[in-house]
Amino acid sequence: MEKEMSRNTWTMRDVFRLSHPKGVNPAIAEFILRGEVLEEAPDIIHGYDAMTKVTSVNGVLSVLEGYPNLPWETIPTHLLNDPEVWKALFHNGQLRGQNAIRNVGRLNKINAFDDMVFAREFANVIADEDNIKASRLHPINYLNAITANRQPGYYEVMETALPGIVHDALNDGFHASFKYVKPANKRTLLGLDVSASMTWGNAIGLSATPAEAGAAMAMTIARTEPYYAVMGFSRRFVDLGISPGMTLDSVMRKTNSMSFGGTDCSLPMEWALKNKVEVDTFVVITDSETWAGRKHPYQALVKYRQQMGIPARLAVIGMTSTGFTIADPSDRGTMDFCGFDTNAPRVLTDFSAGRI
């Protein structure tokens, strides 16, 4: 509540008006509906109210000392440019998990990492495996932070403009996070677009290129799913030879070296049917070209299901696309992704597992 009192013209008061919640703490309701802070209101409301009145960094630090559970979103924007504010938030435990990863660039920009002790403490947190596990951080979260802070002029995926200790911690966290990805435990076939256009621009929702995000997802599937194949849309639909032990840069070099063909989203099903390969979930990752063949992918999926006797699912991810239609809206076994943000991998896994 205290993080998002309003967003996109909607307020918490609108939520109350439309949802008619029951059993709400009267002091919370009074605050949301009328802006009144009653004496019996929870501490976090008193803290939020106090933070709205501060006019200086010292005022922020004083409120954070009295109300350590306040998140950074409660602090006036113009006072978030001081490193001491972020250090206080960090030491209050408010910069953990995704909050820490998302704010790496901001902390670097305001020179917070010039404090060597803070840089070490922060690096320890973002690379800590207990924190990764508890926060359910995905490799894509780390990849996004790394590519968002990429060193200008560098082409290697893992080079950044960050201090070495933070850069190394992001790398360590990226590789450590794979072991905590919850698998779908399905036989998964990934078809990956290897065309040059995958290296142009960023995926919608990420700071990474479609090629980088696709390579990270290939690594995720290879390292977490017990049964998988990673194929490329080259001149033929070919096995890319992606193994669990490969690094992101090595996967990128592998895909960049392939000659490419059109991204025909029906090919994975046609190839699997022709070769009698049993697949539970087909995943296609491309930039925006989602249908370059004569047969609609959904028709190929239906044929595969009928002839193999497997209720296979199909997810098509257009990382730079703002709209396409592959999935049948009436078929729960198909899903289209337009763009690919840091929440998308979990949605994909839940879809593959049949949880959604």
Q: Residue locations for each model-derived region?
A:
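Long lumenal/extracellular ectodomains of secretory and single-pass membrane proteins
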Residues: M1-A211, R223-I356
